[in-house]
């Protein structure tokens, strides 16, 4: 009897389902992507018991013809590709024809659908076997009901996380698909509670407001750029709105949400030194390219893709974000850290909006009766080690503390805010991305946005007080001089000269055999900044001179730290190594806290700061200065009374 035999269709489908259907969120992803491919404009997801009991996805798409309904549940049956050429020119989210077959192999599935013809069809498939098929009255579109997921593979259930975790993963993937498709209205309900709702009006900022909250949506800036092969656009957060995880960045390639480490690094690189250490921006990055430049058939869930000309795309993305942020005034408002309930009262919001230019006015439509929350949509499994990130939820769901509280809770106040917002935004003229001129990827002077400061005093030997016509400024003297030093050293290191300081006593460095091999392999990186290590035995090196910009008395520590970078990070680019060196030197030579400056030194520092390319942050991303506007000061001293009290400013 032969030992090799062909598996049954049922068993084959169960094996295939192991790759495609990992958890309830996988079912939701596949069904929602099918709805998007069906040109739906409204997609509703209903969940029971975090999807383990029931998942129902309804859409108003084009539906499935009666003759195709049964075929749709066969493996590798699809309407989206036909030839090999189609496989390398995919424009749809799905194309393998595995989703329905894989879901039906491990669940009880009932699908009801109808096209414009008006003839509806219902099919019932359980464990891969068709139980029944009949005509049924149904509107145009498709409803897929999935019950008892993994009923015939109980071992899979043992690896499910808690209901909160599984629900968080469902909300995460639907939220990302909603951000990738702002022209589609999405809802997610869990056990009768609305968890996610987007308007589907094609406004990405409005979609973000429904997912992350109004305050986050308002802190986003739009950007765009293109070259011969790529077009990038989207919304990304200002440097003060960050998270402890990279997963708040959503990358969308030709309408498909993907994960790509190099492109994520490119986005972060666009911020330069504006981000705090360990903090990452939020945003949605849309990338459009010829379908021939992207291979989506490399991962079972299609979450990872291969991109042609990835380095070119990364450079375009970094420069687009860098240029856009260079146009922003990045001085934090000193009152931003006050309690939200005090900060965002209705009348204060109107005052804040009066300061926003029409070009940056967000087109968010707060929805009456809906609590817009600043929620997390990150994949919980990916970020559990970094920071707990609860998913968006209704008050009845105990998924964890929300990152922010709703700005408004009362429907009447929402209505009042909506009226005022519409009045304030009435003069805003929306401009299509295609109609705006492309950004000039070139240096933008920050000095034009830096205030003309007059020095007042020093506080605790740590902070400098200064004023300008628009209010009071408080500067961190260490961060300020660190920024000034950084830009000096970045230029000095970038223009490596032959000027070397010879040591009276050479420095000898001893390393392990493995480290010595690595140092020799990366010696060119060290030499790119003027540091020369000569062999001095099998595992030792000698340094006889060093660049003149090394700080006296710290030569050996500086050299050891630079070598440690190479040993830790491996093959760094020359640019990255020079950047790290400039940051280290600027920090070592900056004045520290509790160091008292005389008036001349303080004024000299304030004069140098506007000359910096980025005077707003130290190289580690901390703010250099904060701003109390005249209005802020008047509010703090109650010189501006609330409108319900007097509406007048005191003399």
From Swiss-Prot:
Keywords: DNA damage, DNA repair. The keyword DNA damage applies. The keyword Ion transport does not apply. Residues 383-405 are annotated as: Disordered. GO terms for cellular component: mismatch repair complex. InterPro entries: DNA_mismatch_repair_CS (IPR014762), DNA_mismatch_repair_MutL (IPR020667), DNA_mismatch_S5_2-like (IPR013507), HATPase_C_sf (IPR036890), MutL/Mlh/PMS (IPR002099), MutL/Mlh/Pms-like (IPR038973), MutL_C (IPR014790), MutL_C_dimsub (IPR042120). It comes from the Bacteria. One of its GO terms (molecular function) is ATP hydrolysis activity. GO terms for biological process: mismatch repair. PANTHER family: DNA MISMATCH REPAIR PROTEIN MLH, PMS, MUTL, DNA MISMATCH REPAIR PROTEIN MLH1. This protein is involved in the repair of mismatches in DNA. It is required for dam-dependent methyl-directed DNA mismatch repair. May act as a 'molecular matchmaker', a protein that promotes the formation of a stable complex between two or more DNA-binding proteins in an ATP-dependent manner without itself being part of a final effector complex. HAMAP family: DNA_mis_repair (MF_00149). Belongs to the DNA mismatch repair MutL/HexB family. This is DNA mismatch repair protein MutL. It comes from Lacticaseibacillus paracasei (strain ATCC 334 / BCRC 17002 / CCUG 31169 / CIP 107868 / KCTC 3260 / NRRL B-441) (Lactobacillus paracasei). The lineage of its organism: Bacteria, Bacillati, Bacillota, Bacilli, Lactobacillales.
């Amino acid at each position: 009897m032969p030992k090799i035999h062909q598996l049954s269709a049922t068993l084959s489908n169960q094996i295939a389902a192991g790759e495609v259907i990992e958890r309830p969120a996988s079912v939701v992803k596949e069904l929602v992507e099918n709805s998007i491919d069906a040109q739906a404009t409204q997609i509703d997801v209903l969940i029971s018991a975090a999807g383990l009991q029931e998942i129902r996805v309804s859409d108003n798409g084009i539906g499935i013809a009666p003759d195709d309904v049964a075929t749709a549940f066969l493996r590798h049956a699809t309407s989206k590709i036909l030839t090999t050429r189609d496989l390398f020119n995919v424009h749809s989210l799905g194309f393998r024809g595995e989703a329905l077959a894989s879901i039906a192999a491990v669940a009880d599935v009932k699908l009801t659908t109808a096209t414009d013809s008006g003839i509806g069809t219902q099919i019932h498939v359980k464990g891969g076997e068709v139980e029944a098929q009949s005509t049924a009255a149904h509107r145009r579109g498709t409803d897929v009901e999935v019950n008892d997921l993994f009923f015939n593979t109980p071992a899979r259930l043992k690896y499910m996380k808690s209901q909160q975790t599984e629900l968080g993963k469902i909300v995460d993937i639907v939220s990302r698909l909603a951000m990738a498709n702002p022209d589609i209205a999405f809802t997610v309900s869990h056990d009768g509670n609305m968890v996610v709702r987007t308007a589907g009006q094609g406004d990405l900022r409005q979609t973000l407001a429904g997912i992350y909250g109004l305050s986050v949506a308002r802190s986003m800036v739009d950007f765009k750029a293109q070259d011969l092969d790529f077009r990038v656009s989207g919304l990304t957060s200002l440097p003060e709105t960050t998270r402890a995880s990279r997963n708040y960045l959503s990358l969308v390639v030709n309408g498909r949400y993907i994960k790509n480490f190099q492109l994520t690094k490119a986005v972060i690189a666009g911020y330069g030194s504006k981000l705090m250490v360990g903090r990452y921006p939020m945003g949605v990055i849309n990338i459009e390219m010829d379908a021939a430049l992207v291979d989506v058939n490399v991962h079972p869930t299609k979450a990872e893709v291969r991109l042609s000309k990835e380095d070119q795309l990364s450079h375009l993305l970094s420069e687009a974000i860098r240029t856009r942020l260079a146009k922003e005034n990045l001085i934090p408002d000193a009152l931003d850290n006050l309690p939200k309930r005090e900060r965002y009262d209705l009348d204060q919001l109107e005052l804040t909006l009066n300061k926003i230019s029409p070009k940056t006015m967000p087109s968010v439509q707060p929805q009456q009766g809906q609590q817009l929350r600043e929620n997390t949509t990150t994949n919980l499994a990916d970020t559990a080690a970094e920071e707990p990130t609860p998913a968006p939820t209704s008050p009845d769901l105990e998924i964890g503390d929300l990152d922010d509280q709703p700005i408004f809770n009362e429907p009447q106040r929402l209505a009042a805010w909506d009226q005022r917002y519409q009045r304030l935004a009435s003069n805003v003229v929306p401009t299509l991305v295609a109609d705006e001129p492309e950004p000039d990827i070139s240096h933008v002077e920050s000095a034009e946005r830096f205030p003309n400061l007059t020095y007042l005093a020093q506080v605790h030997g740590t902070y400098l007080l200064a004023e300008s016509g628009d209010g009071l400024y408080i500067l961190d003297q260490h961060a300020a001089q660190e920024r000034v030093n950084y830009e000096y050293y970045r230029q000095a290191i970038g223009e490596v000269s032959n000027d070397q300081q010879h040591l009276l006593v050479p420095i000898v460095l001893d390393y392990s055999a493995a480290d010595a091999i690595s140092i020799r392999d990366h010696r060119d990186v060290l030499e790119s900044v003027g540091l020369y290590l000569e062999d001095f035995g099998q595992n030792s090196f000698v340094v006889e001179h060093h660049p003149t910009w090394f700080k006296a008395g710290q030569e050996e520590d500086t050299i050891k730290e630079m070598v440690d970078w190479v040993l830790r990070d491996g093959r760094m680019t020359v640019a990255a190594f020079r950047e790290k060196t400039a940051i280290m030197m600027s920090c070592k030579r900056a004045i520290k806290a509790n160091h008292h400056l005389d008036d001349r030194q303080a004024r000299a520092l304030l004069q140098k700061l506007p000359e910096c390319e980025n005077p707003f942050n130290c190289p580690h991303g901390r703010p250099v200065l904060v701003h109390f506007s005249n209005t802020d000061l008047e509010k703090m001293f109650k010189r501006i009374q609330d409108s319900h009290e007097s509406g007048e400013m005191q003399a």
